[in-house]
């Protein structure tokens, strides 16, 4: 509002206050001042252009208010307005800070939830992968178990067929079914016999033994089982009683006079055997192990008499047994007791191998050639017992005789080849030994001392004495050349006469002189 009043320049201006406004109190009449206030009041009432909420002026009191009070009131109003504005700004800042804090907290919560969600998803994937792998592993184990169960069932079936084959084979040797079952029960009740089977190992030869059939042909049951089942499933999975049974049968097939010791090992041994004429229908496997010291035997209990079958076939018509005494066999047993277990094992193995060779000589012909062959084999270290010779099969068929003659030739070739290989190995060993001795001798010999070469000078090589000798020898040679050529009366030690009489060329060493010029 404009309250300033222009006064004359001759008057001094008297200011109403110290605020720096242009209003002045000097020269202003009260009438003009009231008119200006009325005009402002009318404008305020009519147009409402200037409205102050805190200022509630009473119309009756307007005339009484002085101008100083109005200015102070306006100043207070402005200051209060500024203070309220400042308070509003402070509240706005507080609200803004609270909103930003809430937003940051909400954002951190969102981030934390996202992180937890990612961790849960990762754990879920890990557990899912672990569960899948575990399911695959369990499924693979189930498949492996099913395969093992199938193989075990096949092995059990093969062993069942094998046991039936052994049972029929033992029955073909004359045993009854009751004896087979009794022996099976005895083997199952005595595990110590199974452990003793592995105490002795015989040295294997360079060549495996030849398998052949003597008097019988393999039956269809044995052929089918051996080819289809037994060889398909090895005996590593078979129980110990069946392996022991197979070992006993194999030993009985290889050596018909095989005896099984019974009773105490340290005390006197009593032997019993069932002598079977001929070989088994089929050599399925060749074992180099025998068992000793067993309380139970595959071939029966303790007896001092042995049973012999008839000489025709294991399955004879009468089926009767002949009991007979065997004094030579008892003497052989006493000799075996003196030598010990190791000699028994070695003799059984060697007798088995020679039995295959010498049975041909005894059965085909009883001439002196067979006796000479038997003596040669015995001299080489392979002996046969008299019982083995007496129990050889009677080969009357010419085809079988030819086959066994060929077998004899093959065995002879085999032995000769074995001897040749052994001699070659011996010669090779001797050659290696000689080479080693030569190497040691060459190392032990002291090397010859080499004398240093002396460089001869020209003056020393062609001295006066050597020249004089050369001239003298030349003169005497010319004088000898002018002698008479008639040699009558010449002494007997003349060199020329000896050359004529001996008619042998004589070569005289000529001394070659190098040139004196350098």
Curated annotation (Swiss-Prot):
Name under which the protein is recorded: Myosin-binding protein 7
Name of the gene this protein is made from: MYOB7
GTD-binding domain ranges (all copies): 69-167
Biased composition (Polar residues): 310-320
Modified residues (Phosphoserine): 385
Subunit composition and interactions: Interacts with myosin XI-I.
Coiled-coil features, chain-numbered ranges: 399-431
Residue ranges of the region described as Disordered: 276-350
PANTHER family: BNAANNG28530D PROTEIN, MYOSIN-BINDING PROTEIN 7
Record's function text: Membrane-anchored myosin receptors that define a distinct, plant-specific transport vesicle compartment.
Swiss-Prot/TrEMBL keywords: Coiled coil, Membrane, Phosphoprotein, Transmembrane, Transmembrane helix
UniProt topology in membrane: Single-pass membrane protein
């Amino acid at each position: 509002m404009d309250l300033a009043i222009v006064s004359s320049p001759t008057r001094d201006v008297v200011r109403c206050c110290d605020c720096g406004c242009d209003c002045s109190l000097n020269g202003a009449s009260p009438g003009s001042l009231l008119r200006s206030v009325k005009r402002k009041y009318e404008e305020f009432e009519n147009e409402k252009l200037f409205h102050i909420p805190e200022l509630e002026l009473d119309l009756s009191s307007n005339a009484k208010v002085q101008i100083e009070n109005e200015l102070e009131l306006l100043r207070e109003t402005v200051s209060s307005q500024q203070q309220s504005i400042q308070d509003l700004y402070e509240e706005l800042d507080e609200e803004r800070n609270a909103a930003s804090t809430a937003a940051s907290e909400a954002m951190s919560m969102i981030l934390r939830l996202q992180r937890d969600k990612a961790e849960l998803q990762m754990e879920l994937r890990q557990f899912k992968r672990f569960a899948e792998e575990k399911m695959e592993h369990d499924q693979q184990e189930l498949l492996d178990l099913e395969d093992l169960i199938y193989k075990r069932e096949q092995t059990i079936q093969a062993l069942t067929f094998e046991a039936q084959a052994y049972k029929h084979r033992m029955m073909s040797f004359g045993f009854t079914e009751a004896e087979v079952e009794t022996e099976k029960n005895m083997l199952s009740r005595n595990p110590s016999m199974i452990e003793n089977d592995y105490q002795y190992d015989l040295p294997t030869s360079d060549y495996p033994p030849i398998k052949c059939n003597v008097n019988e042909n393999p039956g269809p049951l044995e052929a089918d089982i051996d080819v289809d089942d037994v060889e398909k499933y090895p005996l590593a999975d078979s129980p110990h009683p069946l392996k022991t049974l197979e070992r006993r049968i194999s030993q009985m097939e290889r050596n018909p006079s095989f005896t099984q010791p019974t009773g105490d090992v340290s005390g006197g041994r009593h032997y019993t055997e069932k002598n079977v004429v001929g070989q088994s229908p089929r050599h399925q496997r060749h074992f180099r192990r025998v068992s000793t010291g067993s309380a139970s035997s595959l071939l029966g209990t303790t007896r001092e008499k042995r049973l012999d079958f008839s000489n025709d076939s294991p399955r004879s018509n009468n089926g009767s047994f002949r009991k007979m005494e065997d004094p030579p066999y008892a003497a052989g047993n006493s000799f075996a007791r003196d030598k010990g277990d190791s000699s028994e094992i070695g003799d059984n193995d060697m007798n088995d191998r020679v039995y295959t060779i010498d049975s041909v000589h005894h059965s085909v012909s009883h001439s002196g050639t067979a006796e000479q062959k038997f003596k040669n084999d015995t001299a080489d270290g392979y002996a046969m017992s008299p019982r083995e010779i007496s129990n050889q099969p009677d080969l009357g068929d010419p085809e079988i005789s030819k086959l066994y003659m060929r077998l004899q030739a093959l065995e002879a070739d085999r032995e000769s080849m074995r001897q040749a290989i052994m001699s070659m190995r011996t010669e090779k060993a001797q050659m290696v030994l000689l080479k080693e001795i030569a190497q040691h001798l060459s190392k032990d010999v002291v090397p010859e001392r080499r004398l240093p070469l002396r460089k001869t000078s020209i003056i020393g090589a062609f001295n006066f004495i050597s020249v004089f000798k050369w001239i003298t020898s030349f003169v005497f040679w010319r004088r000898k050349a002018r002698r008479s050529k008639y040699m009558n009366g010449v002494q007997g030690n003349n060199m020329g006469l000896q050359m004529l009489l001996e008619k042998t060329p004589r070569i005289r060493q000529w001394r070659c002189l190098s040139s004196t010029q350098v």
